[in-house]
Amino acid sequence: MTLIILILGLGYLYLAKLASNLDFVSTNKEDFDIDPTVEKTLEDYRCVAILGSDARKGQGYDGSRTDAIIVAVIQKSTGNIQLVSVMRDSYLKIEDANKSEKLDKITHAHAFGGGVNTCKSLNRSMDLNISEFVIFNWKAVSDLVNEMGGIEVNIKSNEINDLNRYGPETAQNVGGKYKPVNKTGKQIIDGPQAATYCRIRKSSGGDPGRGSRMKIVMSALMKKAKETKISTLNDVAERVFPEIRTNITKTGILKTIAQIPSYEFGKNRAWPKDYYGGLLNGVWYAVPRTLESQIRWLYKTTFDKKGYEPTSRAKSISNEIINRTGVQ
């Protein structure tokens, strides 16, 4: 979500000052275990993990899971930005708290090792080159939307029940009051409503629906930001930056600002495209069908790399998933 703030167009020097208010995590590129072949293949792409934590009000990010996982793919040569949402229940290879690798839900990676572990797991399982992450909780989303004066979204009929069912709980967690949504269609929603809109999934599209709504909110914030005065955006950043954790350095933030004029949003996608959703030993997972083929699809559609051959590491993980689940 910090990427939204970065692209808002805040004053260069003022933003440098505000950046010191971020919850900064120092990392090294070697921490992210990027395959050398992948690094070369994706040299024209900057991938940033945007992670929505399920940490409740008053809780820190450490030990929390990720309710939302979005990879922002920025093509350096064109400025095109694509958002790829990864299903939180995707059955992938992660590291546990003891640094042992195992197959599990990708959402658990953050609980075991924070943003670095999530990015490293995505890199290993999906042949990505992520070395930057932004972590936010639903309070940050709520505060951001409120500071922007609300956003316009199109509420569908199957979303209303979940919104009003989980809205009061979300409002309590983010420190606000929930106003029931009483109609479908385009309408302005406030912070607690937007945070709930991003979280719901039970009867409103499941995990893919949640990822889609998160991308809708990000796009709506972008649209609203383009219509907002700089002075208001400064107030937004002052309020929200302290709630956001990232390893993007101040230099990296300012470099992003300098590239803003060339940025354009392209097509958004949900990953995996083809998967088995069901119980394995009593636990629901989204099992890529197969991991290898889903990597090829991602490279073809997102990176314009037709005929991409996944790394031996990714193929090994794919075979392990097939052997463990029988899904292929």
Report residues per predicted region.
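Non-catalytic, solvent-exposed segments at the cell envelope interface
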Residues: 1-2, 9-328
